[in-house]
Amino acid sequence: MAEEQAYHVSKGLECIKALRENPPNMEEIQEVSNIRDQTYKSSKESGTTGVQEEEITQNIDESHTPTKRSNSVSDVLQEDQRGREDNTAPVEAKDRIEEDTQTGPAVRRYYVYDHCGEKVKGIEDADSLMVPAGPPSNRGFEGREGSLDDSIEDSSEDYSEGNASSNWGYTFGLNPDRAADVSMLMEEELTALLGTGHNAGGQKRDGRTLQFPNSPEGSIGNQACEPIKKGHRREVSLTWNDDRCWIDKWCNPICTQVNWGVIRAKCICGECPPVCDDCKDDPEMQNRIWYETPTRETK
């Protein structure tokens, strides 16, 4: 390939050099283009071979021998026609590949061709394997054609009803051949995991069942016999192993002692008193040493 490319490059440079030394006029360019179009159309209709096309181009060259620039243009025409002949080989190789890949609806075949369009023998890679279009099985595929029917029959027996392998979850010993098989197995595994989580409603860890907690509004509505005291807020802890912990807390009033750097909790219910019952009548509450100003703490 490198020698052929170097040959074409050298020829192209020679043609460019010749055209720079003796540039053709518009009449000669138009005449040569008309002759090329006529020869191409006639060869396409009559099906002439490459040898006849070369004879036609030689006749054109002989008719334009008086000038050196005409020879350079004829060289360009010859290289163009050779390029057309060289381009036919990849097209034929592509047609052969398409014919080989359409052998059956359930089998995909891949072959390797060289630049001449001939099949290369002795190359065995992942693309040369026969891959069925059905679901993955527990057995790896082989490159032999006779093993395809056996693998299909064995897979139908393995995935029969009542067998543990019929579950599409992850099983040890599974040997997928391609990345597509691995992604399919991962999707099936995730689907099975999500299905079991929704059906069971809970998961067991170390012998204990994790229950998802209900919404606090619904839980409080069910506890109608225990109303919330005024000035309190109610919190519910995480439900673990059917044990529920209800916590009653005061919203921090301004008379509660806090340490420096502690952020006072804000009242979210709007009903908590600003001070406790013990301090509401204390005239010295404003002089507590752990506050700078009570108004600043309530912001």
Curated annotation (Swiss-Prot):
GO biological process, one term: symbiont-mediated suppression of host cytoplasmic pattern recognition receptor signaling pathway via inhibition of MDA-5 activity
Binding residues annotated for Zn(2+) 1, in chain numbering: H232, C251, C276, C279
Keywords in alphabetical order: Host-virus interaction, Inhibition of host innate immune response by virus, Inhibition of host interferon signaling pathway by virus, Inhibition of host MDA5 by virus, Inhibition of host RLR pathway by virus, Inhibition of host STAT1 by virus, Inhibition of host STAT2 by virus, Interferon antiviral system evasion, Metal-binding, Viral immunoevasion, Zinc
Keyword hit for Transferase: no
Acidic residues bias locations: 148-160
Task of the protein: Blocks host interferon signaling.
Stated name of the protein: Non-structural protein V
Organism: Phocine distemper virus
